[in-house]
């Protein structure tokens, strides 16, 4: 990854996180955060700055050695919640009757169309999921910020978001209030660069051209990484380029199976599910691939239903 290459490159002194927006789920945020945590073992600095930290961005940024906030900025810290909507009464008013086929007590995807409230089973699984996720978030932030989980939960109970920025410093969530215009000088000081000297900064795209500090493998052997992202369709009946086209995935997996240079396959799955038929066909193709070489599955933000 870019973070790992930055860790190994002696010319790179640290990482600056400009916390503006990041469309990622908790699993992806956790992976990036762990990579940053590993980067810090090199002794290099990590600094985060934000005008408005969402809860997810703060979770990621809290791993930094220093967390900076604009004096007029804000930080969201208020826990997790699920707010499903139910459309049964609306559908009845417009004369629509849903025909539902489902298997399993906890298969709750259709509940908004056939119920007016959450079932006991769905409430149970959502509570377990949210409690587990929040527990991981608070434990990680508590460790990085040298705070207790109890203190973090107390702040969340206050629904912290629109409080003055000074509150975030007072309660230990933020280290320093600083205007964005002064951040560059702050970073120069950490990197040991004179205030009047130029400080080159590499973006993530620039890191693509930075070579890894590892010997080049000349054996010709390959570990393939195959990405399966999006909803799963049934194959030929679907014409969209988005999501997981089951027929294409099956062909690709067959090619990987037949390629003698590919010694193993990492299947990266980020999917909420979709077509039961398409999922079954992909499952069979993966099993055929397993007979020839090792297959490791890496699950992303979603690996639900057919994705699982």
Residue ranges and their predicted role:
Residues 158, 165-168, 177, 183-184:
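PDZ peptide-recognition modules
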